[in-house]
Amino acid sequence: MKPEAHIEDIEFVPDRSLSLETGRIAKQADGSVVARLGDTMVLSTATLSDSVNESNFFPLTVDYREKFAAGGKVPGGFIKREGRPTDKETLTSRLIDRAIRPLFPDGFYHDVHVVNFVISAGQDFDADVIAGVGSSAALMLSGAPFAGPFAEVRVGRVDGDYIVNPTMQQTEESDIDLVVAGKEDALVMVEGEAEEISEESMIEALDVAHRSIRRLCEGQHRLVEQAGEPDPFEWEADRVPEQLVQRMREEYGPKVADHIHGPYSKETFHGGIGDLKDQAVDDVLGDASETPEGYTASDIRDAIGEVEKGEMRNMIVEEGKRIDGRDQTDVRDLWMEVGYLPRVHGSAIFTRGETQVLGSITLGTSDDVQPVDEVFADTDKSFYLHYRFPPFSVGEASYLRGPKRREIGHSMLAERALRPVIPEQDEFPYTIRINADVMESNGSSSMASVCAGSLALMDAGVPIEKPVAGIAMGLVQEDDETTVLTDILGQEDHLGDMDFKLTGTRDGITACQMDMKIEGLSRDVMLKALKQSRDARHHILDRMEETIAEPRAELSSHAPRLTKLTIDPDRIGAVIGPGGKVVKSVQEETNTEITVEEEEGVGIVTIAATNQRDAEAAIERIKQIVAVPEEGEDYVGTVKGIRDFGAFVEIMPEKTGLLHVSEIDYDYVENVEDYLEVGDKVKVHLLEVHDDGKMRLTRKPFVSEENGEQNE
């Protein structure tokens, strides 16, 4: 029997609707929804565990996967099955996770798993924001203690007009690409990139997004009404007992306050708080494992942590001071240096307080592009940034593994920040890779990576239009008091209510990422944070320009020199040769790297050399290969083979003609080897080129009839 499906069509902008369907598939999940926009469909499910996770954080897992079959494609490579998540899948999972996480209550420690499968991939709309709406609707139907709904939309701007959920073609033409998540009354997450837009334009984009978000949230409420309200999930909050927090505040609050107001460094701050926790455990427990009330050492430590949080937030709101002595708008001390690494193509150290990033540049050829094989796009990236956060940067002893979700997310954020100033390929035909290695971290290492990357690009001589800087903004909201913080420390990020990262040039914003720990952010606070970040960004740019004012005029001596030649596309095969034989031989002879490709009906040969002499040698060889022999012209060739009927003479690379025995001399030639040997240089005249490319040569014009010798 066909199950009954409940469908809600939501017109989020005039003449464009997103549909939500439940009850047809995946009914054993606690909540399941199929979200559809155009031909793109996403199955979103939400499942909750009955048991409590032993961790002391909310165990939320969000997965987003694009099935190649959804787009009528088969995965590339030897294994024809989807493997580990792609970067895009990881980034989309993070987008949804960051919107969901602040909407669950403190003390909820049951595992929550949200899964999104792209089951149909249309040609017009990407699936990422559709999955966000589906995830929210699935949670609404699951009975979870979820303070939703929320909705995600993409905002673009083409020719000055804002577009909600633009087509992929419109996104390509847009100067803004923002993903915005929010509830009916506030925004909870923002991420995206832009081409140096103003703070006012950013606010306009967010306003446009929020109008559609409200409609999508209202539609989710209607879907739940159709399907029936789910039974609420039964759970008990696992919070630090308020009586214990109050006791610790009375007994240790003054000590915590004194420590917070004292001299600051990351090590002394955390060490001192740790000592106070140890002291409290010893004082309260002694040799016992728990108190008569059942409080354990873990409970006592958590209670001191709550006291610390309260004291730090009160200090910020009431005194206008922060734990390191700065006021709300101060940027930490800066120092930076370029050219630190002698062998790389460009390098920079950027240090802000106790956060430090070493950036390095590698310039490569088109062989070094990053191929991207995805359901919605097959592209090649000629600019990419890799962020790495080794454990020693925070004083930890741990294992080095592959990139984690956070590292992939920070890599993309920094890459987006710099992308608008990267020159076009026709101006600077290099593949550019940035390594951003965190050396020390005490907050905002991704923004330090943007600054280090910008400095390193200029040190490498990459002709970027202007430098880019980044800053992380924070928020502390207590009752009616709201304080926006510039350049937040790690502890301010941990105990605060917002992490809002913004990057840009002097002329505007290039990228942003906002995460909330409370249920949302008002428009006025958002505008204040944007304007405050602009002042900080300009301050950092001033210091960066003191270090290096503009890109170096010359590339590093270790960087490849790229030269591009255009050739007839019909000659590409001649340059490459059978099995790559010809191009490999040219590379070996000239100590260069050569790539050959066709673009828009034109053959493009790119030569990478470390010096001008090698480049010129390779250029000459390529020109010889692609040159076309002309009838009536004279050539100096090399004898490649001898037969009874004549000799084969190579007059150009890979172009050999027949010098018939009758054309070697005016006299009768009985034995060709009496006149020519393999390897001899011989001057010939091209008599004829046949339709099949075969050439007929003669030596007679250069032979004296009297002595039978070739004239010089």
Curated annotation (Swiss-Prot):
Residues 632-700 form the S1 motif domain. GO terms for cellular component: cytosol. It is an enzyme of class 2 (transferase). The keyword Endoplasmic reticulum does not apply. Keywords: Cytoplasm, Magnesium, Metal-binding, Nucleotidyltransferase, RNA-binding, Transferase. It catalyses: RNA(n+1) + phosphate = RNA(n) + a ribonucleoside 5'-diphosphate. Residues 560-622 form the KH domain. Mg(2+) binds at D493, D499. InterPro entries: ExoRNase_PH_dom1, ExoRNase_PH_dom2, ExoRNase_PH_dom2_sf, KH_dom, KH_dom_type_1, KH_dom_type_1_sf, NA-bd_OB-fold, PNPase. Its cofactor is Mg(2+). Belongs to the polyribonucleotide nucleotidyltransferase family. This is Polyribonucleotide nucleotidyltransferase. It comes from Salinibacter ruber (strain DSM 13855 / M31). The gene is pnp.
